[in-house]
UniProtKB/Swiss-Prot annotation:
Stored Pfam families: Globin
Biological process (GO), any one: hydrogen peroxide catabolic process
Name of the featured protein: Hemoglobin subunit epsilon
InterPro entries the UniProt entry points to: Globin, Globin-like_sf, Globin/Proto, Hemoglobin_b, Hemoglobin_oxygen_transport
Domain Globin, first and last residues per copy: 3-147
GO cellular component: blood microparticle; haptoglobin-hemoglobin complex; hemoglobin complex
Provenance organism: Bradypus tridactylus (Pale-throated three-toed sloth)
Keyword Metal-binding tagged: yes
Keyword annotations from UniProtKB, A to Z: Heme, Iron, Metal-binding, Oxygen transport, Phosphoprotein, Transport
Entry's Gene Ontology molecular function annotations: haptoglobin binding; heme binding; hemoglobin alpha binding; metal ion binding; organic acid binding; oxygen binding; oxygen carrier activity; peroxidase activity
Binding positions (heme b): 64, 93
Modified residues (Phosphoserine): 14, 51
Subunit and partners: Heterotetramer of two alpha chains and two epsilon chains in early embryonic hemoglobin Gower-2; two zeta chains and two epsilon chains in early embryonic hemoglobin Gower-1.
Length: 147
């Protein structure tokens, strides 16, 4: 279990309140699919994923990215119970989708890159540390069903 200080919780929540979930979600998932192309196999029903511009402009990628980032909103609200918050998604991704749990870590790291690019100087090392801790906790929670 990951323990967050009150300061870390406030830092994460403060930045999260400024995130455009729709815009950032599409960018996070799109970048994951471009940078780690083997992840595309989980999205074969998304249509054209043949190039980075096709991926980044794909409406299904954008829609699912929004859904993924909305789940991160649940993490922000329930930082003290990530395992419980993501139990259903862990089961889905393990039992039905057979997603390699390492992909959750990759997604989290891409999310941190996107947040840094969106928030620039506001994304200080302290903010990054809090977010890295959160995305690591979410990745562990999503991988829980695998253990």
């Amino acid at each position: 279990m990951v323990h967050f200080t009150a300061e870390e919780k406030a830092t994460v929540a403060s930045l999260w309140g400024k995130v455009n979930v729709e815009e950032a979600g599409g960018e996070v998932l799109g970048r994951l699919l471009v940078v780690y192309p083997w992840t595309q196999r989980f999205f074969d029903n998304f249509g054209n994923l043949s190039s980075s511009s096709a991926i980044m402009g794909n409406p299904k990628v954008k829609a699912h990215g929004k859904k993924v980032l909305t789940s991160f909103g649940d993490a922000v609200k329930h930082m003290d119970d990530l395992k419980g918050t993501f139990a259903h998604l862990s089961e889905l991704h393990c039992d039905k989708l057979h997603v390699d749990p390492e992909n959750f870590r990759l997604l989290g790291n891409v999310m941190v890159v996107v947040l840094a690019s969106h928030f620039g100087k506001e994304f200080t090392p302290e903010v990054q540390a809090a977010w890295q801790k959160l995305v690591g906790g979410v990745a562990n929670a999503l991988a829980h069903k695998y253990h």
